Amino acid sequence: MTEKKNLSCSFCGKNREAVDKLIAGPSVYICNECITLSYNIIVTDKPSKDSDSLSLENLPQPLEIKKFLDEYIVGHENAKELFAVSAYNHYKRIFYPEQDEIELEKSNILLVGPTGTGKTLFAKTLAKKLNVPFAIADATTLTEAGYVGDDVESVIERLLTLADYDIDLAQRGIVYIDEVDKKARRSESNVATRDVSGEGVQQALLRLVEGTIIKVKLGNGKKYSEDFIEFDTSNVLFILGGAFVGVEKTIERRLTKSSTIGFNATVIDADAKNNLLSKLLPEDVIDYGLIPELVGRLPILISLENLTEGQLRQVLSVKNNSVDQVKTLLAIDKIELEFTEKFYSDVAKIAIKQKLGARSVKSIVEYSVMNIMYRAPELQKSGVTRVVFDNYPISLDKVPTLVYSDGNTHTDTEYKIYRGLNEKATLE
């Protein structure tokens, strides 16, 4: 008994009463604390496979990046090319050997476009292609340091966490900050009026975007003994996005500013008005309310137009689309879903009317199958193997058809149309 009481860790010297567990080897003992410390040292020092995977030699070129974006994003051809080149140049800059006479500056990106045009998807898909950590934040939740809410640097904490605290990997990651336009307020007279707290957030963003060293607080599961770690944002690709509602008026005002009354007056036709975002310049964003210093650190300005009805139809065919997702979910219940081209066309028409872009397509599709999903176990037990949607079920005369294992088919008389999205689902 005396011998057991005197047992101690062969590494730190603590006796068994001072630790939670003491593990015995052939001739040595190790406590739980030394095991944890040793594991952290090994994991921290171990080179990350992900951080080694991206280099100048295997960096995807613009054509390859664009092709990958095409798999997930419909339309926006020019925007995808600009985006691909900008991302390629950013990472070339990271891997380019430093030379005294040439300093390559960061090329952060500002995406401007209406809701549902795919701003977030652009950033997320790029990170997927490059296999780098990706953190997203909503600018509306960000506040200046000292105020209630998340400060701007919290997004870097998130990036580091997603990189499993691999500092080198995180410092090559991508940060997307959405709704940055909400930090730039405008008055009813269309004159930009700065929101003091919003401008404070912009100033804090400026510091991160241009590249600085900050101290990041480490959370639970940290690999380092310190509570803080220094993080250099110089090589992080920052992508800021926003709808900038009403910026078209700013563009139109700029385009007509130099016009004169009479025969020489500049007239903007209807087609040009529908494509005003394609003429967006940095000065328009500044006039909207972003501070010039921040806009200057976002040299790549990319505008995204609303998708056409035909393009919204294509959204149902891209990789990981909403149709494939609901089909997979019901396949688990051993029920096959079938949609006709008329159904797809109806979805696109409804999405156009709702004016929420590609984002609404997923909701529209999901609402159509909600009642089938609710009754799936019951339908499967009754012998239903397939459900066919010939139209979008906006009314009870357009409900789906049930196909049974014996080959018989019946109109789904029990189908229920849920209110909500379908209240606006008109095809007239």
Regions found by a protein language model. Give the residues of each.
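AAA+ P-loop NTPase nucleotide-binding core of proteostasis motors
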Residues: 2-24, 29-33, 39-43, 47-135, ...
